[in-house]
C-alpha cells in the first residue's frame, strides 16, 4: 500500500527538527500517524467571490480533524477579472492561473501533504487549483464559495448581473441616476457573479469532472445549505485518503477520476449549458497537467452532437445560476445528457463509484427523496450581504418543466447544436472558439469587412468613436498569451458594441479571450496567435472575413499567394503590433510570455522549452 507522503517529514529520528516545527503549529503525538490534509483557501477582500471565505477553511479543518485527519490551511492569490478589466490589470489575470497552480504545488510538495481540499470560486482560481490537483495527483476534493445572488431593481423587468451594469453605463441615452441604480443593484451579495460566466461555469464543470459534490456550482453563497458542502468536503477528503493509502484505489486520485472520459463529460456539460469560452482554455490546460490527451479536435467533435439544454445569463436575462439550482442543478443537466446517450456514466466521482450512481441519487426528476428536493429548493433571500450561509430561503416549488423550463430535455432543447463551437480556417489554423449560445441565429453565417485594431484599448476607442459600422468584423490582435501578454478578456469591446446597437450586426475576432459575460458573434482564442506567427497578424483593414458557424469555418477571403506575400513581409518586420502601445510589461509578465503557448494548448507553459 502507498505510505502517507507526510511520513517523509513526521517519522524517523532525523525528522526531529521537522516534528518540533509541526508541534509548534499545534500537532500532538497522536497526530503524526494521521493523514495531513492541505486546505488551499483563496480568501481575499479584493474579490466578492472570495470575501466570505476567511473562516471557511477553518470550518473544513475542524471537520477533517473530527473524522481523523490533520488539517493545515494556506491561501493562494485571487484576481477579480471584473475589477482588473479595462486597464493593464487584466494582463495579470490569466498569468495568475499559473501562479495559483504553482503555489498550491509548492505548498503541498514542500510540506509533503497527503491530500488536498481546494476552496476556490472565481475565474482563474478554480482552474489554477484544478491544474495543481492534476499535477500533484493526491486525493483532492473541490468546494467553491458559491454564486452571488442575482440583483434586482425596479428599473428593469428582469434580474441583474454585472454585465447589465456595464452595458447601461455605456449607453449614452441612460441617465446618471439609472446607471447608479444598476451599479448599486447588480452585485448584491458575496459570491461569484450570478450568470453562467467563467467562475460559475468552472465550478459547475468540477461536478461533471467528478471532483466536487452535487450543488458545488449552483447553491448560492449566502445559503445555509452551502455550509454542509464545506463540511462534507472535509469528510470526503479523509475518506479519499483511506481509499488511496489504505486500499490503493486509483479512483481516489484526481487522475483516476478526471480521465479522458471525464473531460469529455465536462465539455459535454459546458456545451449543453452554454458555458463561458474560457472554460475551453482551462479544460485544455488541466488536461495537459493531467497528461490526458484531450484537445480542440475533441471539443469540435462534441460541439457538433451535443444540444443546448440550458440557457442562462448572459445568453438570456430570464435565468441566473440560482434558477439552474432550482431546476435541479448540474446533476439534472447531466441526467438529461445521460438519458440522451451523451455521457460516459461509468466515470468515477469523489462521492460515488460512478457518475451514473450520482445522477441516480441527485437528479430531481428521477429521485423521490424529500432531502434532495429540499436541497434544490435553496434560493436567494434578496438581502445584500457579504456573509456566507446567512439565510435559509427556499423556493416553494422546483422547476422540473423540461419542455419550457430553465433546464430542458434533449427533445425540447433550446437548440439541437450546443452553446459552444470550434471554427477552423486559414485565419485560425489551430482553431478559434465562439459561444454560439450568445449569437443571434440571423448572423450564424456572416461576411464583413475588417476593422483591425492592435490592442483592446484602441478597439474600445474606435467603437466609442463610431468607427465600427454594421456589417464590420472587428479584429483585435496581439492580445494572445504571448502578445498581450496575458490574453486579456474583451468584455468592454463586446459590451460597447452591444450598447451601440451593433450586437447583432457585427462580428469580433481576436487572439485574446472573452469574459464569460460576453454575448454576440464574438470569436476568440484564434490560434496560432499573432505574436506566434498566426494568420490573424496578416489581416489588413478592408479585407473580408467569412464566418460560417454551421460549417464550423472562418476564412480570410484573400488568396493564398497574397497571404504568402504578407507573411514574408511580416517575417521581415517581426510579429509585433504596428503601433506602439502604452503598456507597461513587467519582468513577471515577460517571464509568462516567454513560455506561454497559444490558446489551443490552453495557454500553458511550453514544456518543450523547459525541457530544452
Swiss-Prot record:
Keywords: 2Fe-2S, Amino-acid biosynthesis, Branched-chain amino acid biosynthesis, Iron, Iron-sulfur, Lyase, Magnesium, Metal-binding. [2Fe-2S] cluster binds at residues 122, 193. The modification N6-carboxylysine is found at residue 124. PROSITE patterns: ILVD_EDD_1, ILVD_EDD_2. It is an enzyme of class 4 (lyase). HAMAP family: IlvD. Functions in the biosynthesis of branched-chain amino acids. Catalyzes the dehydration of (2R,3R)-2,3-dihydroxy-3-methylpentanoate (2,3-dihydroxy-3-methylvalerate) into 2-oxo-3-methylpentanoate (2-oxo-3-methylvalerate) and of (2R)-2,3-dihydroxy-3-methylbutanoate (2,3-dihydroxyisovalerate) into 2-oxo-3-methylbutanoate (2-oxoisovalerate), the penultimate precursor to L-isoleucine and L-valine, respectively. This is Dihydroxy-acid dehydratase.
Amino acid at each position: 500500500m502507498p505510505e502517507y507522503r507526510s511520513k517523509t517529514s513526521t517519522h524517523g529520528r532525523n525528522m526531529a527538527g521537522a516534528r518540533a516545527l509541526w508541534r509548534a503549529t499545534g500537532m500532538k503525538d497522536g497526530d503524526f500517524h494521521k493523514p495531513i490534509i492541505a486546505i488551499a483557501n483563496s480568501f481575499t477582500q479584493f474579490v466578492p467571490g472570495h470575501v466570505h471565505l476567511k473562516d471557511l477553511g477553518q470550518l473544513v479543518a475542524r471537520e477533517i480533524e473530527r473524522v481523523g485527519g490533520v488539517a493545515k490551511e494556506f491561501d493562494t492569490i485571487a484576481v477579480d477579472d471584473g475589477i482588473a478589466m479595462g486597464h493593464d490589470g487584466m494582463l495579470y489575470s490569466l498569468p495568475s492561473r499559473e501562479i495559483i497552480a504553482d503555489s498550491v504545488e509548492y505548498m503541498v510538495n514542500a510540506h509533503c501533504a497527503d491530500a488536498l481540499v481546494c476552496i476556490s470560486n472565481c475565474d482563474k482560481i478554480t482552474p489554477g487549483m484544478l491544474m495543481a490537483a492534476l499535477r500533484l495527483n493526491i486525493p483532492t476534493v473541490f468546494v467553491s464559495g458559491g454564486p452571488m445572488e442575482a440583483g434586482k431593481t425596479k428599473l428593469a423587468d428582469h434580474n441583474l448581473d454585472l454585465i447589465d451594469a456595464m452595458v447601461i453605463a455605456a449607453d449614452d441615452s441612460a441617465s446618471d441616476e439609472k446607471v447608479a441604480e444598476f451599479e448599486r443593484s447588480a452585485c448584491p451579495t458575496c459570491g461569484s457573479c450570478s450568470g453562467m460566466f467563467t467562475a460559475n461555469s468552472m465550478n459547475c464543470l468540477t461536478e461533471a469532472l467528478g471532483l466536487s459534490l452535487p450543488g458545488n456550482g449552483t447553491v448560492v453563497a449566502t445559503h445555509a445549505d452551502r455550509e454542509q458542502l464545506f463540511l462534507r468536503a472535509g469528510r470526503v477528503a479523509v475518506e479519499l485518503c483511506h481509499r488511496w493509502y489504505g486500499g490503493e484505489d486509483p479512483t481516489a486520485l484526481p487522475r483516476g477520476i478526471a480521465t479522458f472520459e471525464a473531460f469529455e463529460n465536462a465539455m459535454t456539460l459546458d456545451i449543453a449549458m452554454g458555458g463561458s469560452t474560457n472554460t475551453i482554455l482551462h479544460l485544455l490546460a488541466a488536461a495537459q497537467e493531467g497528461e490526458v490527451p484531450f484537445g480542440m479536435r475533441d471539443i469540435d467533435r462534441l460541439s457538433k452532437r451535443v444540444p443546448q439544454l440550458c440557457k442562462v445569463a448572459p445568453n438570456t436575462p430570464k435565468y441566473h445560476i440560482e434558477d439552474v439550482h432550482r431546476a435541479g442543478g448540474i446533476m439534472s443537466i447531466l441526467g438529461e445528457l445521460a438519458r440522451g446517450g451523451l455521457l460516459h456514466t461509468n466515470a468515477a466521482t469523489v462521492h460515488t463509484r460512478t457518475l451514473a450512481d450520482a445522477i441516480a441519487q441527485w437528479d430531481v426528476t428521477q429521485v423521490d427523496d424529500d432531502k434532495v428536493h429540499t436541497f434544490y429548493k435553496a434560493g436567494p433571500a434578496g438581502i445584500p450581504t457579504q456573509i456566507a450561509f446567512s439565510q435559509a430561503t427556499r423556493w416553494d416549488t422546483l422547476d422540473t418543466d423540461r419542455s419550457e423550463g430553465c433546464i430542458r430535455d434533449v427533445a425540447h432543447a433550446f437548440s439541437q447544436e450546443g452553446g459552444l463551437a470550434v471554427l477552423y480556417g486559414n485565419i485560425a489554423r489551430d482553431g478559434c472558439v465562439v459561444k454560439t449560445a450568445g449569437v443571434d441565429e440571423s448572423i450564424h453565417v456572416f461576411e464583413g469587412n475588417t476593422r483591425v485594431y492592435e490592442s483592446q484599448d484602441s478597439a474600445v476607442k474606435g467603437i466609442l468613436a463610431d468607427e465600427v459600422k454594421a456589417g464590420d468584423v472587428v479584429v483585435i490582435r496581439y492580445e494572445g498569451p504571448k502578445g498581450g501578454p496575458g490574453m486579456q478578456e474583451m468584455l468592454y469591446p463586446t459590451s460597447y458594441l452591444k450598447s451601440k446597437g451593433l450586437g447583432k450586426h457585427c462580428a469580433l475576432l481576436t487572439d485574446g479571450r472573452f469574459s464569460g459575460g460576453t454575448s454576440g458573434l464574438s470569436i476568440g482564442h484564434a490560434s496560432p496567435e499573432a505574436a506566434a506567427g498566426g494568420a490573424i497578424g496578416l489581416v489588413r483593414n478592408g479585407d473580408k472575413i467569412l464566418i460560417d458557424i454551421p460549417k464550423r469555418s472562418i476564412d480570410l477571403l484573400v488568396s493564398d499567394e497574397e497571404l504568402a506575400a504578407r507573411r514574408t513581409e511580416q517575417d521581415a518586420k517581426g510579429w509585433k503590433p504596428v503601433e506602439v502601445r502604452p503598456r507597461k510589461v513587467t519582468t513577471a509578465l515577460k517571464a509568462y510570455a516567454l513560455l506561454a503557448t497559444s490558446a489551443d494548448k490552453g495557454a500553458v507553459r511550453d514544456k518543450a522549452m523547459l525541457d530544452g
